[in-house]
Amino acid sequence: MTSAPLAARLTVPSGPLFFPVTAYGPDGGLDLDVYRTHVRRGVEAGAAAVFACCGTGEFHALTPEEFAACVRAAVEESAGRVPVLAGAGYGTALAVRYARLAEQAGADGLLAMPPYLVLAGQEGLVRHYREVAAATPLPVIVYQRDNAVFTPESVVELARTDGVVGLKDGLGDLDLMQRIVSAVRTELPGEEFLYFNGLPTAEQTQLSYRALGVPLYSSAVFCFAPEIAVAFHRALREGDDATVHRLLDGFYRPFVELRARGRGYAVALVKAGVRLRGLDVGEVRTPLQEPAEEHVKQLVQIIERGQVLVEEGAGR
């Protein structure tokens, strides 16, 4: 069942969906002051929503106390201007605990991450997410990826569940997504169910996802190059195909290819990008590792090229 307020704010977003990195100090501890700055700058740069403590925010590496502090800080810095959603994951009991912590911290919704490690059947997966959704009044977006892959029938069941308002796809199986969208549309006509492209660097595949009926996407690039992410989002929304393809060819494809050169770069390279832009958010926590120096140098060049493309587009 749809939560109208959140659905209305996300259906046609005014800007990219922002997944902030989590800031750490030199001792590896949480740096809330820098984190607040990161979130505040993102909202001011045009984010349509903040997804705190999710994959890019190293949800896996945060203690419950750190998680609650970050979500509360994101809510305070957003100050009601945009909705704030928080990650919730691990096994059912812990996911419920994180959901309740997010509610207490003032979050507007949840991104329900895949269960930790286990390979479950469809019935168990549906039950898990239903229990998470029942734990709080917060609307829930279910994250499909890795060990949480759904049949179209299971997504229909989830779409019928009170509190479950959408599906974020991090799998990249376009055939499956087409069948999921079709099944929900057929079985629940008129139901407003949200779909998100949640692949790393989702801009690279968003033209294909949009054609399937998946209009929303996450933007890790927004963390370190908001001007590029906003320009792409605007061009996509306005049907400016020339700008879309220019940014895909000149910025996003090179970035995706660089990201593929290291395990964990979907987070580590983004965090390096934030540091390159002048905000010291610290390093990633283990087991992730920092990008190689040569890759950071290449990232500098890619960002500079993207900025040139945006400036050229603005002058047209």
From Swiss-Prot:
Enzyme class (EC, first level): lyase
Catalytic activity from the UniProt record: 5-dehydro-4-deoxy-D-glucarate + H(+) = 2,5-dioxopentanoate + CO2 + H2O
GO terms assigned for molecular function: 4-hydroxy-tetrahydrodipicolinate synthase activity; 5-dehydro-4-deoxyglucarate dehydratase activity
Keyword tags: Lyase
SMART domains: DHDPS (SM01130)
Keyword Ion transport: no
Keyword Lyase belongs to the record: yes
BP terms from Gene Ontology: D-glucarate catabolic process
Pathway: Carbohydrate acid metabolism; D-glucarate degradation; 2,5-dioxopentanoate from D-glucarate: step 2/2
E.C. code: 4.2.1.41
Cited NCBIfam families: PRK03620.1
Homology family: Belongs to the DapA family.
Protein name (Swiss-Prot/TrEMBL): Probable 5-dehydro-4-deoxyglucarate dehydratase 1
Organism, as annotated: Streptomyces coelicolor (strain ATCC BAA-471 / A3(2) / M145)
